[in-house]
């Protein structure tokens, strides 16, 4: 749709008599020609009426040795001596070197005609659009996708498309060549990376990429969605109204949610969220609606001066919890701008040039502060008055009548809203420049199109206005354009015509017109025209009948009807709308398609131009004439610096607090008072709290007064609350459970079908097709999305069709994404009653041996209760998963007296192993030429030694092989968009300023080198340069007269700091101007003259104050490290100072001589790497043996417990190898550096940051872009009969090859051929948690929790709470500054936001700030930032953590404290609640667990036991065995006892075939010990059920439950006593009867 197909070229011909020798010949082509695309060119003869044949050629450039295209056309008077042939350049005929621009020569030859134009070539021959079945997936699931391919005229492209899948790290894991409209699944790996993946598609011979995105997360679908709607688009600072946010919560099947919302407002300032604690409110959600209000007084209490908030944004954080508490959805409305004016004005699609004396059409775009279009807003232009009102898309068109005698025009437009004072209206100004006529002729053409909303089918009025020499204009007889003529009468300066808008003009086109004067002047104008975004064709999806459009039952049959263009291929998909609650960013739409197409427009302005040639250039055209009138040669497919295009796209207590605070008139003191009356989570006294106040003595006094005042009041009130769940065992009137068929099919998307509309079209040319489908069993709303494709009308995305599915009574079983084996968890089933009457319900949990629950094999767990009409009720089921894997959990429910109403749900629950997941990575360099024997490199990868593995859990090993080099991995692994934190304003003393200046310098250097500014925003570069110059100017304050530096000018000068200033300033000169070379060279002179010793070493006499800024230089071998560091600074400044510092070369030689003497004797890997870089940079080292010998694994230079130093040292080593041209050694090093995901910082990380990014940037520059690659790799895995064979060559170098195995065994890899590759072996397993293995460095840490009772006010819907107390002390000599606490919450718990806010907001603040990472699929994490941690006393924090769902047998949570300035200083401790009552009983032997019954053996409750009763019980059908046993010993384990018994006699044999072979274990709960009262060396009669047998590896164990019969069998001597004679006889008879005769039938 772009290129010449977008242009209507109208020629206004002035007829002058004359022969061809005075004729003017014109050639117009697109400014950029696309390969494999039909492009239209125009050739015209003016002043020549002689018919002729023209030959059109397209040649290669510059040699013109190859004809890429040729065509012959006839030019004659019948065609007005104007021809518009099409040309097409085959992609395979032109060079594919994407590193340089490619051009072609368009040539026209004929009698008296020879025209040539060199035109830029583009490989973008079409568009590829990718549709996925949804935008978010879970690991291991299939991604369904379709590929649509079309050219620029929206016609089908018959070209092969290459489709790649890329991980979030940018690694290509799949690459396929596919054909037209292809659809297939890609299966995500279970070990795949979480995050945003890409599908990248491109034509086989084109570098242009088209990308679709999808997210991979561990998630479960919500049951409802929440929408927030602010009362205004912005917060008007001068208003008096409060700010309201409407909350709407709807279940996905359309019904309203009943529940509660917790709302917190805040202000986002410079990216940091500042919450307003007093705004936290609890809002009832009734009938799905609620409203939250931010009062201006509440905002002012947090920010007294509201004017300081202008330019920042409000946000509202809302969490909605259902009435049953079963589900929770959190959302946020952000971007509510705080403004003085509620509007912003932009000049969009407005020409930069005007014609004096002619109308000038000005298009303005008015937005709300959030960027959305502002409709019905009056606007007015000043100076030249014109008024208008914005349309629904926010645009307004103003027509200005320009004066004749001006060359520039200052245009100011403002809003003219009646409710706003003038000073609050939005204003915007621009300057337009006069169009320059050719040779000052005064001839003008203005094309006027006044319509603003244009759609297909309209007749567009077009006016041609001409002004100039009257004699010339009178000779214009007609206007000619491509589809006909428009007559013009003599003296007529305005000619009008109508242009029919056809679908092929969507989404926009350019109308270019020109006329010629004589044989050398062209007068031209153009206008850009936007057309409403609709399909070129037709596609509608709907229900086939009225019945089909109604609400459906789950699994019901229905019909949908498709209507569209005959022959169209229609791709369908149905998506659960819950998916869009989580992510709706990547859904395909018609607007996104047109946006993509419009971005390929080679035009650069909204129309017009600086002069006649500028009109063509700005419209994306190239022109040449026979009189050498030529547009400029275009050298870029993109426009120069284009402007952003915006598409339309408690009362008494409160009274007491308030009255006390009101006693303070000063606002600051009032805040001190108010903060003191907030609850302190740690329980600190008022006096201790006051120690944390930094605002002065007056604030402390006010704080203490109010704190003591409120203390007595706070002690008076206590609240308690409880919960009672009734239970009813009545079973009458319910249908049989076996008659309830459970719902089991709950896909997130389905209906992935492609159909063709083959029916005969109706009178409107529309074909239809009716499809019968069976709905899936989810209670939700399905959104059916249809995308059609036709060869002539391209792609069309229909409006989604919604299908609602629900029942009057149903179960919503809320199952988490995964649970941990042995970890007790609560599963909730929510029962909904949408019937018009109350119902009595029975609900039951079905038994599954994979879980321990209240349901057993003998008896299911049931509850019965009443659910009121139009309400719901949650039923909790507590389970303990016992087996890893996917297991069914099923709940069924029926309604008493209503046989047709029931429901059942069966879902899969994923049970994962306990422990913590660990990864072990091994990297092997495959280089058969260097490492092979006889051309083959063989590697044996040994099995992992995993002593800490959780028993009976799987080990997964993933082998990834990728060809080197890995430059593309750098650019993706080190994401430029994550470097924003480095662009900061320098400040502080001479040392601190350099720390902060380093950040923007290295960020700019890296982003410049890797060309990644686009990821951060190109405007950020100007900001970074500004910060660099700010740092430079501030550092001049600390420059001494001798050009040396210190933290303060009154301190002694530092060798290291001066060298560092030289290094950073020298680096900055590559990016910014204005840094004095004399400043740099002055520092160099000082270093040489004052700090270099005779032996060449540099000496440090005045160490810096901030030792951490020096990185790894401190420590052993410091003289060598200081010398090497200083030498590096001298070398990096050499190009600047070589001419002005005479002694520079000799100084460098002395330093290198010194280092060479020390190099081979160095002990520290860090020192070795730094010295190697210094020597290599000076061209004094080319042998890497010493350097590589100091490495660990040949990919890193490590020292114990010093991660940031290791990053720094490894970066030095990489630089050294690059200087030595040892490129083959660099791949694994680069991979290790990028795998660290280290994005740097300032304090404590300065040197690691600067060296990492300097090294990676240098790698990008120096690494050869390609090398010969032809590798054969064979992997022999233990479980595979046939080896895996991979071939790596230049065609597939970027594709990562992967293999997986679950066997932890040795395997072999062999490689042969040319080139290198990197093999990464990643082993993932679950390791046992071992707190004692945690090493604490520089911190002492204690963590504890205790149960607390919640009053009603604090409950917030929680089921319980713990108080988490964290105490820490820094073990250094001074306080630790800027410390971070990373807390992993217990499963089911969330932090109390009020407690955390109080800790961070008051004047006695204990924490600087906090963040909560609440990923529903994982445990919640809390990050707390502390300004300091004392080294002399314990610092304690305490806050509540609230239990939102029941969890037992939980794994410990963790607390990690570490220094922001030095990540190696850290300590981790674990915590967990007391395992008390309320937990289900389980018994584990080794790693195998069984559910234990809730009651003990009930034998003691039998009133009378005799022989017949024993025979009856022992012969019950479910009794498996009867034994006489002897108790050998009792072993106590965690929570249970093991009774080890010998089976003396098998009275009734059972499943255990040989129980007398070895002693058998009988296992019982600890609480049954007293009831059982079993004694060692006593004999027992015992029998039990088959379900109580527990098969182990080579024997059976037996569970003692309430169904186990145990009686003491007296010894032989006791049987002589009268007391035991009858009992002994009964036992003997029982044994004889069952042994000889067996059980009676």
UniProtKB/Swiss-Prot annotation:
Region (C3a-like domain): 649-727
Tissue: Expressed by the venom gland.
GO-annotated molecular function: endopeptidase inhibitor activity; metal ion binding; toxin activity
Occurrences of domain NTR (ranges): 1496-1639
Domain of life the protein comes from: Eukaryota
Signal peptide: 1-22
Region (Factor H binding site): 1186-1249
Gene Ontology CC annotation, any one: extracellular space
Numbered residues of crosslink Isoglutamyl cysteine thioester (Cys-Gln): 989-992
Keyword S-adenosyl-L-methionine: no
Main location: secreted
Annotated glycan sites: 181, 209
A Gene Ontology biological process term: inflammatory response
Keyword presence, Ligase: no
Pfam families the UniProt entry points to: A2M, A2M_BRD, A2M_recep, ANATO, C3_CUB1, C3_CUB2, MG1, MG2
The Anaphylatoxin-like domain, residue ranges: 672-707
Subunit: Heterotrimer of alpha, beta and gamma chains; disulfide-linked. May be active with factor B in the presence of factor D.
Protein name: Ophiophagus venom factor
């Amino acid at each position: 749709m772009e290129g010449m197909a977008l242009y209507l070229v109208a020629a206004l011909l002035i007829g002058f008599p004359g022969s061809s020798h005075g004729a003017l010949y014109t050639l117009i082509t697109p400014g950029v020609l696309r390969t494999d695309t039909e492009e239209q060119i125009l050739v015209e003869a003016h002043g020549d009426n002689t018919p002729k044949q023209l030959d059109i050629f397209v040649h290669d450039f510059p040699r013109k040795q190859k004809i890429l295209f040729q065509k012959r056309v006839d030019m004659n008077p019948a065609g007005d001596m104007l021809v518009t042939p099409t040309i097409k350049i085959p992609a395979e005929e032109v060079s594919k070197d994407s590193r340089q621009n490619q051009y072609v020569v368009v040539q026209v030859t004929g009698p008296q005609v020879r025209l040539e134009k060199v035109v830029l070539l583009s490989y973008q021959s079409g568009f590829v659009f990718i549709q996925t079945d949804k935008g978010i997936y879970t690991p291991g699931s299939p991604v369904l996708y379709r590929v649509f391919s079309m050219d620029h005229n929206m016609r089908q492209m018959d070209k092969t498309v290459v489709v790649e899948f890329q991980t979030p790290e940018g690694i290509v894991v799949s690459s396929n060549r596919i054909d037209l409209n292809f659809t297939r699944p890609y299966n995500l790996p279970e070990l795949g990376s979480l995050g945003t993946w890409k599908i990248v598609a491109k034509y086989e011979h084109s570098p242009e990429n088209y990308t679709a995105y999808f997210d991979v997360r561990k998630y479960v679908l919500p049951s409802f969605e929440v929408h927030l709607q602010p009362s205004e688009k912005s917060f008007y600072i001068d208003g008096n109204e409060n700010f309201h946010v409407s909350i709407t919560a709807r279940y996905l099947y359309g019904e309203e949610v009943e529940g509660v919302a917790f709302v917190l407002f805040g202000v986002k300032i410079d990216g940091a969220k500042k919450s307003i604690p007093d705004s936290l409110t609890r809002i009832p959600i009734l009938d799905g609606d609620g409203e939250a209000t931010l009062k201006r007084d509440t905002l002012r209490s947090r920010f007294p001066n509201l004017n300081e908030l202008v330019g920042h944004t409000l946000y509202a954080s809302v969490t909605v919890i259902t009435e049953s508490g079963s589900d929770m959805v959190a959302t946020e409305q952000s971007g509510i701008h705080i403004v003085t004016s509620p509007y912003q004005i932009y000049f969009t699609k407005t020409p930069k040039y005007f014609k004096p004396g002619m109308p000038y059409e000005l298009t303005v775009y008015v937005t709300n502060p959030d960027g959305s279009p502002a409709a019905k807003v009056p606007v007015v232009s000043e100076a030249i008055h014109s008024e208008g009102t914005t349309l629904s898309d926010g645009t307004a068109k103003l027509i200005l009548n320009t004066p004749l005698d001006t060359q520039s025009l200052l245009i100011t437009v403002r809003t003219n809203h009646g409710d706003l004072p003038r000073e609050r209206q939005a204003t915007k100004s621009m300057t337009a420049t006069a169009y320059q006529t050719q040779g000052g002729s005064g001839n003008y053409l203005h094309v006027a199109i006044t319509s603003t909303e244009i759609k297909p089918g309209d007749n567009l009025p077009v006016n041609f206005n001409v002004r100039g020499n009257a004699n010339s204009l009178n000779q214009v007889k007609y206007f000619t354009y491509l589809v006909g003529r428009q007559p013009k009468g003599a003296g007529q300066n305005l000619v009008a015509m109508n242009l029919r808008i056809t679908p092929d003009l969507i989404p926009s086109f350019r109308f270019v017109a020109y006329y010629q004067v004589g044989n050398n002047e062209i007068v031209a104008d153009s206008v850009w025209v936007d057309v409403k975004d609709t399909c070129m064709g037709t596609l509608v999806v709907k229900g086939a009948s009225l019945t089909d459009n109604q609400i459906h039952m789950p699994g019901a049959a229905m019909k949908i009807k498709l209507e569209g263009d005959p022959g169209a291929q229609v791709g369908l998909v149905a998506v659960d709308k819950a998916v869009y609650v989580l992510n709706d960013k990547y859904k395909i739409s018609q607007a996104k398609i047109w946006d993509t197409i419009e971005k390929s427009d080679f035009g650069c302005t909204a129309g017009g131009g600086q002069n006649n040639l500028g009109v063509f250039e700005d419209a994306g055209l190239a022109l040449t004439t026979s009189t050498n009138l030529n547009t400029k040669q275009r050298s870029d497919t993109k426009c120069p610096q284009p402007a952003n295009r915006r598409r339309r796209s408690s009362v008494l207590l409160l009274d007491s607090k308030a009255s006390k605070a009101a006693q303070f008139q000063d606002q600051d003191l009032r805040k001190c008072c108010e903060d003191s009356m907030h609850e302190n989570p740690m329980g600190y006294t008022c006096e201790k709290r006051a120690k944390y106040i930094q605002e002065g003595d007056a604030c402390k006094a006010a704080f203490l007064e109010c704190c003591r005042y409120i203390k007595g009041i706070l002690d008076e009130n206590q609240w308690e609350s409880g919960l009672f769940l009734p239970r009813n065992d009545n079973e009458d009137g319910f249908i049989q459970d076996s008659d309830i068929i459970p719902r089991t099919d709950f896909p997130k998307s389905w209906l992935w079908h492609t159909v063709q509309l083959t029916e005969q079209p109706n009178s409107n040319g529309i074909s239809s097709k009716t499809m019968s489908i069976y709905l899936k069993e989810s209670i939700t709303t399905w959104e059916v999305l249809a995308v059609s494709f036709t060869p002539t009308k391209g792609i069309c995305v229909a409006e989604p069709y919604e299908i609602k599915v629900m029942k009057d009574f149903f179960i919503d079983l809320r199952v988490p994404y995964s649970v941990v084996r042995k970890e007790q968890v609560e599963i909730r089933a929510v029962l909904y009653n949408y019937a018009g009457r109350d119902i009595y319900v029975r609900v039951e949990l079905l038994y599954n041996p994979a879980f321990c629950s209240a349901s057993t094999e003998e008896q299911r767990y049931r509850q019965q209760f009443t659910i009121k009409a139009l309400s719901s009720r949650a039923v909790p089921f507590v389970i303990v998963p016992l087996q890893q894997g996917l297991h069914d959990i099923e709940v069924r429910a029926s309604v008493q007296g209503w046989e047709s109403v029931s429901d059942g749900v069966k879902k899969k629950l994923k049970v994962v192993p306990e422990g913590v997941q660990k990864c072990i990575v091994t990297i092997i360099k495959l280089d058969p030429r260097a490492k092979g024997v006889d051309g083959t490199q063989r590697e044996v990868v040994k099995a992992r030694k995993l002593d800490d593995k959780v028993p009976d859990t799987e080990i997964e090993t993933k082998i990834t092989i990728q060809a080197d080099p890995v430059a593309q991995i750098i650019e993706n692994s080190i994401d430029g968009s994550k470097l924003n934190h480095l662009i900061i304003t320098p400040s502080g003393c001479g040392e601190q300023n350099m720390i902060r200046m380093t950040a923007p310098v290295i960020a700019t250097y890296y982003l410049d080198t890797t060309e990644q500014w686009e990821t951060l925003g190109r405007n950020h570069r100007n900001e970074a340069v500004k910060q660099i110059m700010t740092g430079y100017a501030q550092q001049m304050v600390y420059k001494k007269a001798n050009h040396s530096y210190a933290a303060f000018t009154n301190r002694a000068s530092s060798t290291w700091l001066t060298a560092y200033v030289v290094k950073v300033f020298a680096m900055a000169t590559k990016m910014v101007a204005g840094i004095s070379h004399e400043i740099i060279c002055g520092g160099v002179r000082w270093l040489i003259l004052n700090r270099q010793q005779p032996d060449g070493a540099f000496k440090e006499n005045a160490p810096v104050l901030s030792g951490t800024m020096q990185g790894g230089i401190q420590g052993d071998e410091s003289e060598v490290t200081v010398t090497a560091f200083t030498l590096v600074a001298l070398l990096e400044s050499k190009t600047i100072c070589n001419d002005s510092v005479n002694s520079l070369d000799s100084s460098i030689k002395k330093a290198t001589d010194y280092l060479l003497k020390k190099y081979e004797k160095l002990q520290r890997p860090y020192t070795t790497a730094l010295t190697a870089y210094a020597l290599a940079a000076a061209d004094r080292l080319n042998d890497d043996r010493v350097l590589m010998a100091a490495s660990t694994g040949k990919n890193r230079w490590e020292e114990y417990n010093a991660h940031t130093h290791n990053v720094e040292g490894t970066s030095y080593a990489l630089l050294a190898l690059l200087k030595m041209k040892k490129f083959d050694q660099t791949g694994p090093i680069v991979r290790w550096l990028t795998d660290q995901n280290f994005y740097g910082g300032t304090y404590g990380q300065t040197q690691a940051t600067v060296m990492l990014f300097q090294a990676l940037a240098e790698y990008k520059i120096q690494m050869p872009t390609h090398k010969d690659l032809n590798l054969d790799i064979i992997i022999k895995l233990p479980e595979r009969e046939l080896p895996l064979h991979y071939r790596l060559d230049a065609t597939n170098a970027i594709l990562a090859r992967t293999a997986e195995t679950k066997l932890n065994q040795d395997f072999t890899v062999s490689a042969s051929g040319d080139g290198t590759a990197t093999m990464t072996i990643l082993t993932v397993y679950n390791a046992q948690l071992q707190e004692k293995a945690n090493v604490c460095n520089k911190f002492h840490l204690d963590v504890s929790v205790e149960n607390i009772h919640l009053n009603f006010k604090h409950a917030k819907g929680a089921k319980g709470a713990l108080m988490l107390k964290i105490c820490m002390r820094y073990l250094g000599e001074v306080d630790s500054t800027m410390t971070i606490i990373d807390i992993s919450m217990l499963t089911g718990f969330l932090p109390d936001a009020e407690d955390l806010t109080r800790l961070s907001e008051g004047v006695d603040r204990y924490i600087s700030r906090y963040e909560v990472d609440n990923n529903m699929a994982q445990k919640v994490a809390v990050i707390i930032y502390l300004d300091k941690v004392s080294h002399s006393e314990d610092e304690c924090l305490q806050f509540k953590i609230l239990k939102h769902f029941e969890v037992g047998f939980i794994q410990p949570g963790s607390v990690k404290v570490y220094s922001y300035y030095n990540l190696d200083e850290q300590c981790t401790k674990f915590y967990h609640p007391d395992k008390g009552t309320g937990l289900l009983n389980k018994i584990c032997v080794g790693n195998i667990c069984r559910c234990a019954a809730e009651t003990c053996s009930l034998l003691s409750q039998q009133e009378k036991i005799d022989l017949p009763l024993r025979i009856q019980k022992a012969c019950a059908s479910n009794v498996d065995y009867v034994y006489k046993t002897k108790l050998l010993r009792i072993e106590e384990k965690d929570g249970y006892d093991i009774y080890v018994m010998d089976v003396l006699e098998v009275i009734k044999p059972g499943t255990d075939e040989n129980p007398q072979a070895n002693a058998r274990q009988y296992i019982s709960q600890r609480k049954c010990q007293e009831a059982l009262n079993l004694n060692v060396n006593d004999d027992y009669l015992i029998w039990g059920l088959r379900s109580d047998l527990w098969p182990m590896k080579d024997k059976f164990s037996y569970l003692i439950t309430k169904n186990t019969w145990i009686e003491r069998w007296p010894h032989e001597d006791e049987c002589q006593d009268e007391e035991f004679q009858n009992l002994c006889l009964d036992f003997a008879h029982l044994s004889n009867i069952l042994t000889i005769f067996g059980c009676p039938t």
